[in-house]
A protein has these predicted regions:
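C-terminal terminal-subdomain/extension
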Residues: 1, 66-113
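Compact nucleic-acid interaction/catalytic patches
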Residues: 19-25, 29-66
Length: 113
């Protein structure tokens, strides 16, 4: 698996341990730095996407528009950031722009500050 920071991948988040954790096979944004992504490190930090759109929820969610193999507009659910095993990655779908990555970093900083 050679995911890069800012890429959107299809992953298998099943099984989830708690009802408030996002599960299913779904798209996620890779948020881990590329030094770790390109090493033998066994996990990757991701942020899940949802196609159940909720308006006016920044900094908890960030809307992105469809592109490449991302077939629908989606919300990045910033509060669901987590690490997953690299075996869960299935297929690359799209990428965020540099501007979108900067905004995502800013929103995550707001959530954890």
């Amino acid at each position: 698996m050679m995911a890069c920071k800012g890429e959107i991948w299809l992953v298998n988040l099943n099984p989830s341990k708690k009802p408030n954790e996002m599960s299913k096979v779904r798209l996620v944004v890779v948020f881990q730095n590329n030094e770790l992504n390109h090493s033998d490190y066994p996990t990757t930090i991701i942020i899940p996407l949802s196609i159940s759109l909720v308006d006016d929820t920044e900094p908890l969610r960030m809307r992105i528009t469809k592109r490449e193999n991302l077939e629908k507009d989606s919300d990045i659910v910033v509060t669901q950031i987590r690490a997953i095993d690299n075996d869960r990655f299935m297929q690359k779908s799209a990428s965020l722009s540099l501007k979108e990555m900067e905004k995502l970093k800013q929103l995550l900083n707001e959530v954890v500050s």
